[in-house]
């Protein structure tokens, strides 16, 4: 309890979060729409936004200029605010945006979406998403696109490509009845980005869906990390890249195709944060285009093998779980244990368990007798009462 409130802990990604139980009940009573596992494999391509899909920060492409500020001074002030107050840098820029807009421009959701409409995109981005989805269809793979960004959701929703994404995870504002931004509704920083990978993995896409904590068998996971691609450009993407890498997924660093500055991707490659890097050129036939298509091809082949593996595993589990097979399984284990026994104490222990089983097939009796003949340690104690009694019962 905290100040009279009952708090409930739950795990979200790598975090433990405490929630007011009253709020928790309201959230958990809601029916969430979840994505279920399909018969075809699914590849999730997750993107940062600024300098990954767009050549510059979204705030620097209209908003900062509209409040009469310079890009460099805006970020200097915002980052200074964060440093002076031990404040999250993303909360600091959101606060700075609201404060600077006051008395100068309307700071509404519509205004932010209008700024987003002016955001420039890298070459090929506008046709990329459909083209890659269609390629997946040809290979028997479902391709889904997701945004995981510290930028503003409202601005991304104003871009030409907003409707191409299954879900946009980004920082956003709470608005009053007049549509004016009042307070952060969601803030996403470089570490909290990882929780959304778990949501994508399990199909629990709503940010309030506690189902992200549910246990899923490996074969029931909708999008395993091995089928995820993360495309980013900087340090803020490192936690997601590292997580995906650790589970055999694919992380791609991109750099501006005009400046050709590869310093960041070289550093990320050196630090084992990314597996590949390419220019942020999304046109057909580009390095990035060919790389992602190769990943889709590999996924199609690999998931066929995984499907066979899970079928075999399911058959084995089903076989072992049948009542008629439980004793057979126990007999098989004891026979193997006896064959591998290397001490008198161990042999006597195994014999005591074998004596409890009354029904042996001719083949099993033959196996047991062969073991006694070949294992010199067993052979030397054949006259011991328990061993002699057991083998006599096999006659």
What are the residue ranges of the model-derived segments?
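Surface-exposed polar/charged interaction patches
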Residues: 77, 81, 101, 302, ...
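C-terminal cap/substrate-recognition subdomain and adjoining C-terminal extension
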Residues: 126-146, 150-360, 392-394
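Residue-level signal for secondary-structure boundary elements
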Residues: 75, 90, 102-106, 140, ...
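Extended alpha-helical scaffolding segments
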Residues: 347-395
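Alpha-helical substrate-recognition element adjacent to the catalytic core
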Residues: 29-177, 268
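N-terminal amphipathic/basic-hydrophobic helices that include classical n-h-c signal peptides
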Residues: 1-27
